[in-house]
Amino acid sequence: MLKLEKITYLYDHLPMCFDLHIQPGERVAILGPSGAGKSTLLSLIAGFLAPTSGHMLLNNQDHTASPPAQRPVSMLFQENNLFAHLTVEQNIGLGLHPGLKLSGEQRLLLQHIAQQVGLESCLDRLPAQLSGGQRQRAALARCLVRSQPILLLDEPFSALDPALRNEMLQLVDQVCINRQLTLLMVSHNLDDAARIAQRTLLIVEGRIDYDGPTQALVDGSAAKASVLGIKSAVIS
């Protein structure tokens, strides 16, 4: 479970406040204009930013003031942050131990995750030898080996071409189902949101302006669809 109660934060003179309740295993997309607070919301959940006030429960534990390393979350950004001098196997292994001192059990887990994301034949390669999609797969694998119940994605596939982006979304969808992960994914693409999440949050000026079915935004039946440039089917 993920629960935010009046979590506030001041960003460049824009006061933000978030109230949110997400059930275990739920997949939620986060949309909204640039600068509205989408990435800030994820950073608050991950612990990279400290809220001014409020209360946060992650996995039924109070993590309002916990440092990032102690939170039950993994986060993947648009920039994959792979180390160029390390192999794919070593980059993934950093998710298990910063010094890469892995036990036999951890090595087996790494091999299993690499197979899940389709990188079992690339483990001895350097990031420069991978395609853009493979690099994002490696970054995703590094998140998954941590075995945390909450996965945060901050536009990690936006730089990929449509075919690769769709491939990665299908992979994330399958991984979340298999591992029963709770997912929050920031995107600027409503179609991507619809592929992976039945529920969408629309962030506007530091507030959750819409919390409801993704499909209602797609077909314009939600009045707030106009924020995304979609003509609303609602007659006022």
Curated annotation (Swiss-Prot):
Keywords noted in UniProt: ATP-binding, Cell inner membrane, Cell membrane, Membrane, Nucleotide-binding, Translocase, Transport
SMART domains: AAA
Primary residence: membrane
Residues in ABC transporter domain copies: 2-230
Subcellular location: Cell inner membrane
Reactions the enzyme catalyzes: thiamine(out) + ATP + H2O = thiamine(in) + ADP + phosphate + H(+)
Top-level taxon of origin: Bacteria
Membrane topology: Peripheral membrane protein
Binding locations of ATP: G32, P33, S34, G35, A36, G37, K38, S39
Cellular component terms per the entry's GO annotation: plasma membrane
Matching PROSITE patterns: ABC_TRANSPORTER_1, ABC_TRANSPORTER_2, THIQ
Leading EC class: translocase
Statement: the UniProt record of this protein carries the keyword Membrane: yes
Signal peptide (from-to): none
Protein EC: 7.6.2.15
Sample GO molecular function, one term: ATP binding
SUPFAM superfamilies: P-loop containing nucleoside triphosphate hydrolases (SSF52540)
Protein transport among keywords: no
Function (record text): Part of the ABC transporter complex ThiBPQ involved in thiamine import. Responsible for energy coupling to the transport system.
Subunit architecture: The complex is composed of two ATP-binding proteins (ThiQ), two transmembrane proteins (ThiP) and a solute-binding protein (ThiB).
Similarity-based family: Belongs to the ABC transporter superfamily. Thiamine importer (TC 3.A.1.19.1) family.
Protein name: Thiamine import ATP-binding protein ThiQ
Source species: Yersinia pseudotuberculosis serotype I (strain IP32953)
Lineage: Bacteria, Pseudomonadati, Pseudomonadota, Gammaproteobacteria, Enterobacterales
